[in-house]
């Protein structure tokens, strides 16, 4: 039986469609993502916590879902908005269609709405709070009340909500078409010990580190610098994550202590913003953020353009950079800051999401640079 669904934005705009997920309601900040593929990775990316994701590509669900493509152990997106759900999921890796997957994870979703209109509205007015209600006779008044009551992401610390509860080891490399997901590697085959802070880490980013010889100790977001330094890491990785970096004072203080050492530090997304804050810069909330797999970014050092995956609603304010932070990357969409490098320490960061799968691989050299810094640190420490 087909059930109705309704999306209402905080400005009162309504979109009527049909429910393709769980019955109930979902409230969050409505954003749009321009990726053509990777919807399962998007749904399970912890960076989308408290967000309702609109996918601009018209056909979503063509290839179904499978366990190997999950970026974390659960769906983190608050809700899903799409134009059309295909009747058939066709792929040799498919184990469950998208609608069944959403229902199993209790995710409210709506289809058959004008996603182009919604995206243009969000671009013009900025990201808005919204509410999806799915079921018999959705109540528009109730949806509007819930949308207006949502506090928004500004000032909200979600990293400590999505982080791991316990420290764990990670030694699995990346998926390949020939062999699929590999078995975990022996730690004897991984010469570099990297401590990875989980602010909402994606599995594929961890896999890219393992591909380059790193054995990972993944720690909760609120782990102290003293605990990490006792682990004698060769490098420290600051992961991606959701929401506003400014309230994460525990992470900022830990990073400040790492910057008093010569241990290499590499930050991605939220980790990039936290490194900037720990170095004395400031961050700002963006109008509608960057969400997609086709964002051009200029590498200022190499004078080349990279196509990158992006997922962030906050950015580092370039005007606030102290003298010891050098700009390395800038967005060619809006000129916002995309990368920094400390001039006095082996620490650098990138705003986008270097991807193992399914996104672009242009930013992979950033991982290679991290390994170069680790090798130099190890040789200098001897």
Curated annotation (Swiss-Prot):
Which pathway does the protein contribute to? Amino-acid biosynthesis; L-arginine biosynthesis; carbamoyl phosphate from bicarbonate: step 1/1; Pyrimidine metabolism; UMP biosynthesis via de novo pathway; (S)-dihydroorotate from bicarbonate: step 1/3
Q: Which residues cross the membrane?
A: none
Span of the secretion signal?
none
Where is the segment annotated CPSase? 1-189
Q: Which UniProt keywords apply?
A: Amino-acid biosynthesis, Arginine biosynthesis, ATP-binding, Glutamine amidotransferase, Ligase, Nucleotide-binding, Pyrimidine biosynthesis
Entries under HAMAP family matching the protein: CPSase_S_chain
Output this protein's name: Carbamoyl phosphate synthase small chain
Q: Which organism is it from?
A: Salmonella typhi
């Amino acid at each position: 039986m087909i059930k109705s669904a309704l999306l209402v934005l905080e400005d009162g705009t309504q979109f009527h469609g049909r429910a393709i997920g769980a019955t109930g309601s979902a409230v969050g900040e409505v954003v749009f993502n321009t990726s053509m593929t990777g919807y399962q990775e998007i749904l399970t990316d912890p960076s989308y916590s408290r967000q309702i994701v609109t996918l601009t590509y018209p056909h979503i669900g063509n290839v179904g879902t499978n366990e190997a493509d999950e970026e974390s152990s659960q769906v983190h997106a608050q809700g899903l908005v799409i134009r059309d759900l295909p009747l058939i999921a066709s792929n040799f890796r498919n184990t469950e269609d998208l609608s069944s997957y959403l229902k199993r994870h209790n995710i409210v979703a709506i289809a058959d709405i004008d996603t182009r209109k919604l995206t243009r509205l969000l671009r013009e007015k900025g990201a808005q709070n919204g509410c999806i209600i799915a079921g018999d006779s959705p109540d528009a008044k109730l949806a509007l009340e819930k949308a207006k009551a949502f506090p928004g992401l500004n000032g909200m610390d979600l990293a400590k909500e999505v982080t791991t509860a316990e420290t764990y080891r990670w030694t699995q490399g990346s998926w390949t078409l020939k062999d699929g997901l590999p078995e975990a590697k022996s730690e004897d085959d991984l010469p570099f010990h990297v401590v990875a802070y989980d602010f909402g880490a994606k599995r594929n980013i961890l896999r890219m580190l393992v591909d380059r010889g790193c054995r990972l100790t993944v720690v909760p977001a609120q782990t102290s610098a003293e605990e990490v330094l006792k682990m004698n890491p060769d490098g420290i990785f600051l992961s991606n994550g959701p929401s506003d970096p400014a309230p994460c004072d525990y992470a900022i203080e830990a990073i400040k202590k790492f910057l008093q050492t010569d241990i290499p530090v590499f930050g991605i997304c939220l980790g990039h913003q936290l490194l900037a804050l720990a170095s004395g810069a400031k961050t700002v909330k963006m109008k509608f953020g960057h969400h997609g797999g086709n964002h051009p970014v200029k590498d200022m050092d190499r004078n080349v353009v990279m196509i990158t995956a992006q997922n962030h609603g906050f950015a580092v304010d370039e005007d606030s950079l102290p003298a010891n932070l050098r700009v390395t990357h800038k967005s060619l969409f809006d000129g916002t800051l995309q990368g920094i490098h400390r001039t006095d320490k082996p620490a650098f960061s990138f705003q986008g999401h270097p991807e193992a799968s399914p996104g672009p691989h242009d930013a992979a050299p950033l991982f290679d640079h991290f390994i170069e810094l680790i090798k130099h640190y190890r040789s200098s420490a001897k």
